[in-house]
A protein has these predicted regions:
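N-terminal intrinsically disordered, cationic/polar leader segments
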Residues: 1-40, 44-63, 70-72, 79-93, ...
Length: 132
């Protein structure tokens, strides 16, 4: 099979898989990935590890935030979209503030709030309450 045919087949099978998925489930999954990336960056700062994993997850978190912010539907849901934009902007600022000042709690604030909103229960709650 030629490379172009393989790419087309892959893209078609990838798109076919998304047709039956609820858009809210996709939105939740993206936010779950954001929580995980924020958590990893926070842990790496705590361990004082500056490595590819930390950098990759920092970039991943920023990319997810940017993607979420640019795909909000202001025409359909103005207030909700505005509120979500502000919330993701808060997350973005805390991420950048945390990575530049090496303060993991700044990043953890975003992750904990996302975790609570979507009820992921990904982040362990031991000692987290003093973060918020």
């Amino acid at each position: 099979m030629k490379l172009n045919q393989a790419k087309k087949f892959y893209k078609k099978s990838q798109n076919d898989g998304l047709e039956n998925i609820n858009p809210f489930e996709i939105f939740k999954k993206i936010n779950y990935e954001l929580v995980k990336a924020l958590q990893i960056v926070s842990e790496k700062i705590d361990k004082k590890e500056i490595d590819d994993v930390r950098q990759k997850n920092f970039t991943k978190a920023l990319t997810i935030i940017y993607t979420l912010q640019t795909n909000l539907n202001y025409e359909k849901e103005l207030k909700l979209s505005t509120d979500l934009f502000k919330f993701y902007e808060f997350c973005r600022k805390k991420l950048i503030e945390g990575i530049t000042s090496l303060k993991s709690k700044e990043i953890l604030k975003s992750a904990v709030n996302l975790d609570k909103i979507f009820n992921f229960n990904y982040i362990q709650t031991n000692g987290i309450n003093d973060v918020i």
